[in-house]
Amino acid sequence: MCIRDSKGIVRVGCTARVTEVVKRYNDGRMDIITVGRSPFRITQLLNSDAYANDELLQGDVDFLDDREHRTDARTQEELMRLYEVCHTLIFEDYPRNLEGEAAENLSFLVASTLPLDLLWKQQILELRSEADRQQRLVGYLREWAPHLQKEERARARAGGSGIN
């Protein structure tokens, strides 16, 4: 999976596993739900003109490994706390996907679950250190959580309907 920005196809993406086919169309297209897997960098697009024709892109990639796997326990705990707060405010439910999650995957779990800006998620994907990803997410969620709490209070005052 890769996204496109104003400059074209970004060079860092990730492999994806299809977890669910939501809908099949008569022309063969499908609405699917996927889970990102291994990050990669595109080294060469073999058919870059295919994108303009809405066709499948093909290319050569290098799979990316993290530079380091150590994380700071305090940063990790704060990220989990902020994730729980934001998830609960957005989805009105406690996140159940934290149990048994490895520390080296926490940033990807948080970024994939919360409705963050797509280009912001791209920045997280491009970082090659779990510690860096966790620090970046903590900074973002620290700023975002108060806005979510403010929106929640406004919804509660409006009777939960969002209509005044």
Model-flagged regions — what are they?
Residues 4-164:
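N-terminal low-complexity, acidic/polar interaction/targeting segments
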